[in-house]
Amino acid sequence: MAIRQLPEILINQIAAGEVVERPASVVKELVENALDAGATRVDIELEEGGVRLIRIRDNGGGIAPDELPLAVSRHATSKIASLDDLETVATLGFRGEALPSIASVSRFTLTSRRHDAEHGSALEIDGGRLGEVVPRAHAPGTTVEVRELFFNVPARRKFLRAERTELGHIEEWLRSLALARPDVELRVSHNGKPSRRYKPGDLYSDARLGETLGDDFARQALRVDHSGAGLRLHGWVAQPHYSRASTDQQYLYVNGRSVRDRSVAHAVKMAYGDVLFHGRQPAYVLFLELDPARVDVNVHPAKHEVRFREARLIHDFVYRTLQDALAHTRAGVTPNSIGSDGAGDPGATAGGLGNIAGSGVPNHGNAAGSSGSGYNYASWTPSQTPLGLRVDEARAAYSALYAPPPSSAQQSAGMPSMAGTGLPATAQDSGVPPLGYAVAQLHGIYILAENAEGLIVVDMHAAHERIGYERLKNAHDSIGLHAQPLLVPMTLAVGEREADTAEREAETLATLGFEITRAGPQSLHVRSIPALLANAEPEALLRDVLGDLREHGQSRRIASARDELLSTMACHGAVRANRRLTVPEMNALLRDMEATERSGQCNHGRPTWARFTLSDIDRWFLRGR
């Protein structure tokens, strides 16, 4: 068969197969063009899920009449002019493929007016066939109409889903955009009816976060903001107990561009580690900012993916930032309301990095809807170091420390003193710590405590398990991983890529407890293994570690295996169900929870405590109605 030059229309239709997957792809490309043009308001009109009509109207800079035909030509763009521009591109679009690709598979109309022009101009394209530029009344800005998407490519049109499904994809992308660009007003209508409006606001305002991901996420989000090595990571991560069955609330933006990146997703999952219940997914909205020259955005035609020039550094930066933020969450801590004072300050965090820099105790804001006294828990700090693994070892000290003095009213009325019970005189006592004071034990499993806001219920085994686990980890971290030499070196047959990785990462492997030398093109000599994991399967473990090093530049397999062992030890050492605790012992456990990192979840990701405010309890009994 002879080689022939393809016609321009067919070339554009082939390109549309990569750029225009469904109506949501069209909306994405057109709205990104509007934002690159400086628009502060974008109206999106849809019919039949975007298949019959997509109309995007913006108030951006507009296009000159003589540039309209050029705007729908392949690889014509105002955003880059050289390779240097491509390597440092900061705009959302730059390839010059979207408009001609969309126009080749639809009935397309482009109308625009510059702010200094007397009137607008319009250009119609029918299935890739270019019309004439004609004058048309139009407000400053640009309107793009896309009718009958894929009308001339029936094979593509039959693969489109139901109207509701296609509309859902558009709405999901608009949610992602609304999180990244809160300064832009977005108005959406479907089949002639308004369906969504995102009002302009501040990045750290609760309005945009709440209306996109829900008020529950906004209440449970920890704000993070950390910079270093020319990188900045800021945004929100949900507390571990706010987890999802799917990845539907995971948003990553690199220099303002919504992307998917396996390395960053892996770093986030690692950071949640042993605080996330099995099979659950974390929720987050993260913005990573770095020099555009350090990231390649010209990887995918739809620009969904990026390639970092320092992938290992990015992975480690994200992991350590989020791990630090999550590590400093403690039982009794409620994230600050997003709309509270300092909400507009990127450095103001809720249990995140901004708080932990200056204090060992996070800021304890009042829970939303609580009927407490408004006492600022940030003023309360434990007055002693944490206990050992057994809560009864210092019960006398705790009893003396936390027993409130009798009030003068009690003494004058002849009422018995509450000293020695571990209970405050009233629930509104300004000295009440976050988890309050124990009042009873329920079925030998749960501790019931009263704090300034209401009732606290603690799973005593889960809580004590986490306390012991964190102490075991800290003890082992202080002495490091010891290597245990093998009497007979083990020869391991591996692939050539694995052998190259082992040779290149010899120093990293040594810090993990492995002493490895290359024995041949596809074999390794293993002379020592981590002592703590001597009874594990070193061959399988080493293969997993090498796979992680090759894929992500680092591995936590050893640490994870060690943590699993320590978790088992802590579980066996924790207080068991049906063991009766005295009130001072229960108070000792509560104080240790408040001083222990990640104490909101046990080693397996289950919650260790729950709060019921007075407002919640009042609703149970219909009080105040």
Swiss-Prot record:
Assigned protein family: Belongs to the DNA mismatch repair MutL/HexB family.
Source species of the chain: Xanthomonas euvesicatoria pv. vesicatoria (strain 85-10)
Matching Pfam families: DNA_mis_repair, HATPase_c_3, MutL_C
Underlying gene: mutL
GO terms, biological process: mismatch repair
Disordered: annotated span: 333-356
Function: This protein is involved in the repair of mismatches in DNA. It is required for dam-dependent methyl-directed DNA mismatch repair. May act as a 'molecular matchmaker', a protein that promotes the formation of a stable complex between two or more DNA-binding proteins in an ATP-dependent manner without itself being part of a final effector complex.
Transmembrane segments: none
GO molecular function: ATP binding; ATP hydrolysis activity; ATP-dependent DNA damage sensor activity; mismatched DNA binding
The protein, known as: DNA mismatch repair protein MutL
